[in-house]
Amino acid sequence: MAGGNIQFQQFLADEVRKVEGIYVPIHAGIIRRLLVRKTTLKRLHPNPDDEFCFPKIGPNYEIVSNYEREYRRIRKNKNDARFVSPAAKEPLTVERIRPDGYMIMNGHHRWAAAYRTGLKQIPVKIVNLTQENDIRKMLAAASHDKRVTLDLDEVVFQKEKNGPAEKPLPFPFRNIYRERLRLGIPALFRYLGVHGYDVWVFSANYYSMDYIRNLFRMYHAHVAGIVTGTARKAPKGSHTKEQLENRMKEKYPMTLHIDNAAVTRVDSRTKTFAEFPLSGNDDTWSKEIMDVIGGMETQK
């Protein structure tokens, strides 16, 4: 087994060298994203900026071995696939890249197990993550000098069992956009726009930017900025993230951070902040935020 690990480590290093400093993420059209559900392992490339590819960190071979056992079971008898763990059946999250193929964003250990097992193809989900140039374009198109930031998964999306949610979309859209918005989000976003705020939503998860934008359109909720895949590490030696943060501060001297428990106002000019607690009642969450912002406007 140790010899196999060393062999894979060399293969991984060779694959990283093939793409490091060369690859460029490019947009994948809707047809490609809908039709491409599997791809060959030859078209998949490890992400040089992921810890999986760092020589001092690298793969967790215990995890890889667990996936290998499950993949071998599938190869031996496809009927056994129903007994395989959901994680093993989960598609790899990938981005289309130039010059060729797809960059793995999530699922390196499954990719490694598939390679070591000799699988020819593996399920994939193609996403268009927010790129640095997308953020520049959204900043240029934004119309206000104040912004509100919210976390998609922690604040905006609501699992019905956890609290009140907006009504599901009509068929067939409910089968495409499965996420439910928290009750009051469309009304809150409209209120924020009327009062001179650009709404920016963020997520560490690997959602396609256009998927999120279209989801909000279905609910008649406008957002100025969408940033997905924030868990990604910046390329080595890149100062772009710091530059974009500085540009954000220049564009928006005042920012409101909204979460489940409070509204926090941050003034980058005076370097001051103020916190406005919320009651925690999901039924009145959006109205309480409107009241907080209305109070700020009155104090001016």
Question: What residue ranges belong to the model's regions?
Answer:
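C-terminal cap/substrate-recognition subdomain and adjoining C-terminal extension
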Residues: Y207-K300
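Well-ordered, non-membrane alpha-helical segments in soluble/globular domains
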Residues: Y61-N79, R178-L188, M209, S286-I289
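A short acidic-Thr-Gly-centered motif at the start of a beta-strand
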Residues: E90-P99, M138-A142, R247-K249
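Surface-exposed, charge/polar-rich loops and edge strands
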Residues: G4-R33, K38, P59, R98, ...
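Short alpha-helix boundary/capping and kink motifs at helix termini
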Residues: F11, L41-M103
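Short active-site oxyanion
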Residues: P99-M103, V194-V201, P253-T255
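Alpha-helical substrate-recognition element adjacent to the catalytic core
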Residues: G58, A142-A234
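A sequence-level detector for short glycine-anchored, His/Arg-bearing signature motifs
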Residues: P99-Y115
